[in-house]
């Protein structure tokens, strides 16, 4: 345990940020999972809507610093490519 007052405060701040980041990452996984289920079902309309929502969540996470902007771009591109393959 830290002895310095500022470090004790920092531990609490870091814990809050960690919980917030974990929640955002969980939302991202859920959004991407919904895209993949729509793709596997072959439902193009649902997949397009899910990609839109997932892209929004990825951009938001990147702007908040939860994930890197390049990682967000790569994930968006990957799921968009998969949706484009649906006939």
UniProtKB/Swiss-Prot annotation:
InterPro entries: Ribosomal_bS20, Ribosomal_bS20_sf. Residues 1-22 are annotated as: Disordered. It comes from the Bacteria. Keywords: Ribonucleoprotein, Ribosomal protein, RNA-binding, rRNA-binding. One of its GO terms (cellular component) is small ribosomal subunit. It holds the Pfam family Ribosomal_S20p. One of its GO terms (biological process) is translation. Disulfide bonds: none annotated. HAMAP family: Ribosomal_bS20. Binds directly to 16S ribosomal RNA. This is Small ribosomal subunit protein bS20. It comes from Clavibacter sepedonicus. The gene is rpsT.
């Amino acid at each position: 345990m830290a002895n310095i007052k500022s470090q004790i405060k920092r531990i609490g701040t870091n814990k809050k940020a960690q919980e917030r980041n974990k929640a955002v990452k969980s939302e991202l996984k859920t959004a991407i999972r919904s895209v993949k289920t729509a793709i596997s079902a072959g439902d193009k309309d649902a997949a397009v809507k899910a990609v839109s929502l997932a892209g929004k969540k990825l951009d938001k996470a990147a702007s908040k610093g939860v994930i890197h902007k390049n990682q967000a771009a790569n994930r968006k591109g990957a799921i968009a490519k998969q949706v484009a393959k649906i006939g």
